[in-house]
Amino acid sequence: MAKRDYYEVLGVERGASEAELKKAYRRLAMKYHPDRNPDDKGAEEKFKEANEAYEVLSDAGKRSAYDQYGHAGVDPQMGGGGGAGFGGANFSDIFGDVFSDFFGGGRGGSRGGAQRGSDLRYTLELDLEEAVRGTTVTIRVPTLVGCKTCDGTGAKKGTSPVTCTTCGGIGQVRMQQGFFSVQQTCPRCHGSGKMITDPCGSCHGQGRVEESKTLSVKVPPGVDTGDRIRLSGEGEAGTHGGPAGDLYVVVNVREHAIFQRDGKHLYCEVPISFADAALGGELEVPTLDGRVKLKIPEGTQTGKLFRLRGKGVAPVRGGAAGDLMCRVAVETPVNLNKRQRELLDEFRKSLQGDDSHSPKASGWFEGVKRFFGDV
């Protein structure tokens, strides 16, 4: 019976990448593996066919020969350079994943079974003032801690874990599948080499219990949204004697009523009357350190930025403090009384025919005239 095209066997295009080949092969290996299809000759043949296809296509040299000459290029009986082994393919890596799926375990278990606890994340809400000046806060974090009843062993007090009978205490088992052998984490003890025959009643044999920890967090001055503070060893407790993970406190700075922050600089809007904008003046503006005087020159327009150097934020990693940028907003008066309206009307009449008082408006109107061909 003629062999099927190897690309067709794996269900990939001829230009498939190494990752695509591996993904396709792993899917077929999972589907047709003999352990999942006992006494199914058809599945066994498809499993062997997928093995053969992947063994050739995962090796650059064999794949090149196959692409050029077809099966004849890799079949030694037909003069090709291929062999019967699995030289180019890393089946151990792939089947480590496959077997872990069969048994529900992971490939990360090391000999002895000690595993580091998971890292935790906690979002810390801060006011702008707290973020700029630094602070110390107390937080409560739900986590997994070592069981005090059994000292983290998982075994009932007065008893001890026994040697795993499946792996003989080494935490690994060797599995033979056809042409190859794979060493895998023991599915019974999950790599610890030990079995708990009489589990602790407090943690039910897990060696860890849920608990909320109260921690004090020192927040350095200058932090900003997204900055992380690492508390080493304050994550979840490890298993089988493994170290605890870390806690990452992630800063989120709340919006401020007056200031907007951009890195080390602060921005604020300063409303002024149109009289102060025209005649100039002096007013007080807020900073994080208190009020300061800001001189407004005559003829100030809306949007004008005034820089107060050093009144921003000192960066958390050191360096000069940023600046406070005050953006002027000229306000139009409302709710005028009769006398005020008369004065403004008189003022408006005094401006007629003299464009020098409003250079931007004059330029704008001239542009409009040119646009419509009025000049």
Curated annotation (Swiss-Prot):
GO terms for biological process: chaperone cofactor-dependent protein refolding; DNA replication; protein refolding; response to heat. It comes from Ectopseudomonas mendocina (strain ymp) (Pseudomonas mendocina). CXXCXGXG motif repeats lie at residues 147-154, 164-171, 186-193, 200-207. Belongs to the DnaJ family. This is Chaperone protein DnaJ. It holds the Pfam family DnaJ_C. The keyword Chaperone applies. Zn(2+) 1 binds at residues 147, 150, 200, 203. It is found in: Cytoplasm. Participates actively in the response to hyperosmotic and heat shock by preventing the aggregation of stress-denatured proteins and by disaggregating proteins, also in an autonomous, DnaK-independent fashion. Unfolded proteins bind initially to DnaJ; upon interaction with the DnaJ-bound protein, DnaK hydrolyzes its bound ATP, resulting in the formation of a stable complex. GrpE releases ADP from DnaK; ATP binding to DnaK triggers the release of the substrate protein, thus completing the reaction cycle. The lineage of its organism: Bacteria, Pseudomonadati, Pseudomonadota, Gammaproteobacteria, Pseudomonadales. Keywords: Chaperone, Cytoplasm, DNA replication, Metal-binding, Repeat, Stress response, Zinc, Zinc-finger.
